[in-house]
Amino acid sequence: MNLNPLTALSPLDGRYAAKVDALRQHFSEFGLIRARLKVEIEWLKALAAEPHFTEIAAFSQAAVAELDALIANFGPAQAAEVKAIEATTNHDVKALEYWIKDKTKANPEIVKVSEFIHFACTSEDINNLSHALMCEGARQQALLPALDAISGKLVELAHAYAEIPMMSRTHGQPATPTTMGKELANAAYRLKRARARIASVELLGKINGAVGNYNAHLAAYPGYDWEGFARRFVESLGLAFNPYTIQIEPHDALAELFDAFARANSILLDLDRDIWGYISLGFFKQKVKAGEIGSSTMPHKVNPIDFENSEGNLGLANALLKHLAEKLPISRWQRDLTDSTVLRNMGVGLGHALLGYDSLLKGLGKLEINADLMRADLDANWELLAEPIQTVMRRYGVANAYEKLKDLTRGARVSRDGMQAFVATLAIPEAAKADLLKLTPWDYTGKAAELARRI
């Protein structure tokens, strides 16, 4: 069966292919090979630029341009050529080394030093740097922009709904009023912190040989400061240098990154469920798109499908990302191969995350507030004012203030008239009593509006 979006095993390459296209250049097999190519070429150029290595002369501008062109012009057709070589070698990194040698064999300047391609490297020297570059590219070009779009929309809605009062629900029961804008501001603030954590994770790299000790490097050039050279090279790629490794870079930084994404995803999953609940209560309506169908049998339905899709994909993402974070730092002795197949699923976990972000943003764009229903909800729950009334009573020394309000309101519905009749009996200053008599559930929102506008 030919592979296409209808026959793809994973929905990321099938139904949702267009929505995760931004990640394909980073986490596909092509993306991995291209990242490896960049590392191999930059390593060769760095060796040539170091005067200490007299056996490899500095490249001319033309030679450097030819090497850079290999990276710039590398596409799926070139990746297929590498895969064809791998069919013989049964080794992916060695196949790329042979491909580079073949593509540069017509250049006498490069072919003369072709044995410095992949010089002193173990495959993991190339792979760890490639994986870090892939994650960095995806983080900067696709994932952070997607989170920023959600953050921007949440701030926009928080400001728009800053003063629209809403009855809170703690344990699913009526609780102290807030505003819808403040609740969305809560999510925006949490996401801002999670986003900062994602952005702050330093991705590490190493290029220190088979077990991390520069054995082969020092055998070829004894006494040379290979650690300093490796540090400069890794940092030239925009990565942080890890001086202590086994054959693999231990992946602690990748684990930190995936944990950080999982934390952001949990925040957004929480938001998905809350918005779903507000839609269920009728506090939000969803804009209807002509031609769309909500149910195959119930024509009236407008379902919260975007938030449900987001919740499902973020859950899938976290299952994978948490496994990556737990598994990757563990390797038997100086290395085993269990990380290799797991690392190939980085894009799957982050792909489901990106799908979740896309669906959530789409859903947020469809929301319309139902302020009248929210006010009616508050108007039906005047017992919410038990909190401010008993607090003012306590200020003025009224004995058993909490207990008196508990007797009046616990498990009961109390009308406006009932609450005001109770207030009228209180032995508190007349000004305080007047303030309580003016108080309503819809204006008992504290600093909610201010906090929402401030986000």
Regions found by a protein language model. Give the residues of each.
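Alpha-helical coiled-coil oligomerization motifs
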Residues: 159-162, 199, 203, 276, ...
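A helix-coil-helix interface module used to build multimeric assemblies
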Residues: 2-217, 221-232, 294, 307, ...
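Short amphipathic alpha-helical segments with heptad-repeat character
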Residues: 136-144, 148, 155, 185-188, ...
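Generic, well-ordered alpha-helical scaffold segments in large soluble proteins
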Residues: 42-47, 99, 103, 153, ...
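Glycine-rich cofactor/substrate-binding loops
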Residues: 1-34, 62, 85-86, 282-284, ...
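Proline-centered turn/helix-capping motifs that create local helix->coil transitions or kinks
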Residues: 104-110, 199-202, 280-283, 318-322, ...
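A structural signal for small-residue-enriched, beta-sheet-centric alpha/beta enzyme cores
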Residues: 123, 218-221, 230, 234-236, ...
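Acidic, glycine-rich loop-and-beta core segments that form the ion-binding/anion-interacting portion
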Residues: 221-318
